[in-house]
Structure formats: structure tokens, C-alpha cells
Amino acid sequence: MIQRLLTLLLFSACSITSSAAWDPMQESRDPDTGASKKTMIALKAFRAIPELKAFFEQANGFALFHNVAKGGIGIGGASGKGEVFQSGQVLGSASLKQISFGFQFGGQAFREIIFFKEKQDTDRFTEGHFEFGAQASAVLIKQGVSVETAYSNGVAVFTMAKGGLMYEASIGGQKFSFKPYD
């Protein structure tokens, strides 16, 4: 019994030590953009949508959240991670947080992309002066459906469902943080 306990303790200590050396910046990155593999998969999915071509060509930059998880029963929340691009290169990582109240039920996972029309809009995001108010909304992209939207206050937001079902699909109340890569 004691020998099993010691073996388990030793194994646990070794696994903690090996995971402590993990560096997320060393994960597989695209050599052209510097983006993570997860971000590149999401970027490819958004670039495959013809209606977004003009946004990719004309935007000064964009924040791409490869996975946003959202759920709630009355009180809800969302959290996501992504990266910020400008001139085809990754500037740094971004995170998204949201807390919401009201009638909502369920859970979902989705991707989100925020296009910044001008440099000042990208700068506003990377300097930490950016959040969506309670009335903000995004365009949900569905296969085979026409996408018609324009910039509002220098940004255009699109989401792509990954899975789940949730009554309530606003982006209101989202707050963001940005951390530049060195």
C-alpha cells in the first residue's frame, strides 16, 4: 500500500515538473504570420466565406477568436482566446470575457472575428480601450446564406457556430484584453 502511494506521489511530481516547463509561445506557429495552429484553422474557415473577402482586403487589422465558449441559465458567461493581426502578421494574443443577465438558456461554442477598419480602430483594441456595450450585435455566418453588414464605429463582427444550442446570441457586454508578443 505504501509503495503504491509513493509510486503515485513520484509519478505526480514528475508530471507537475514536466508541465511546468511548457511554454505556450513555443507551440506550433505558422512561419508566415506567426499565428498558432488553432488560429490558422479558424482563419482558413473565415477566409473561405466569399462575403468576407472585402473585409480581409480592406481592414487595417482584425482580432480572431478561434474558440469562444458561452453558456448560461439566467446568468451567463463567455470566454475565448485568440490573436490579433495587422498587415498580415500576428501582433499578440487576445482574450474575451462576457457576463450576461436575462433570459438565456443553453451553451454553445463559436468562432468570432472582429475587423478593424482603420489603424486607430486596431490601436484602440491593442491599447485596451475596447469593449462592446449591451446593444452590440454580430452577424452569425451560416453556410449558403448571404452576409450583408457594414462597419459600425470602425468595427465589423462576425461569428461562426461550432456547436451547441443557446437561446440568446448577442455579443453585448464583451470585454477584451490584449498582450503583445515580444
Language-model segments: residues:
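Small-residue-enriched, tightly packed secondary-structure blocks
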Residues: A21-D182
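Sec/Tat signal peptide C-region and signal peptidase I cleavage site
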Residues: I16-A20
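Bacterial N-terminal signal peptides
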Residues: T7-S15
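Bacterial N-terminal signal peptides that target proteins for export
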Residues: M1-L6
